[in-house]
Amino acid sequence: MKKILLLGDSIRMNYAPYVYRKLCDKAQVVTSEENCRFAKYTLHELPAWLKTFGTPDIVHWNNGLWDAHHFDGVAPLTPVADYAKELERIARLLKATGATVIFATSTPARPENPEWDNGEIQEYNRAAVTVMERNGIAVNPLYGVVAGHEGEYLCDDLIHLNREGIQKVGQAVVDVLSNLL
């Protein structure tokens, strides 16, 4: 049975149980109980997670919402150029495991959310896609699954997935992973 490692922020934490339920009879699905937060945090913690979970066959990973978050109301936590450099380093570490790596784009916020700007989220996603293309890593375009449906798929906190969003995004992840099993 192939081992799938799910890494990412709280959006990943939203859909991970759905993915586990759908794939547990076809693959060993493992995931950090910890929020992988922003790219620099993932880069720092990745060696420990790989040690804990062992070598995966497949990694489905995302970072970006924390990086694009305006915690102080002024600027994103991580400048997009730094975000891209950190993703590059994470990509290299993940590829060195021999796993098939899939990067998931960040999902949008509801437009009325003052802490995120969807134009910026798209800018971060474009930077991420460029890094992944350069590294031969497939991209799961989760932004597109939610875009246009933010009111239907996101909670009242304006950023996290609700039940319907978990099903839609979770199924998009299952579909990509199923093709690799």
Per-region residue spans from a language model:
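Catalytic nucleophile-elbow at a beta strand-turn-alpha helix junction centered on a G-D-S/GDSL motif
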Residues: 2-17, 38, 68
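Short beta->alpha junction loops
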Residues: 31-38
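Alpha-helical cap/lid subdomain in secreted, periplasmic
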Residues: 2, 22-28, 43-181
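Conserved donor-binding loops in enzymes that form glycosidic bonds
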Residues: 9, 34, 159
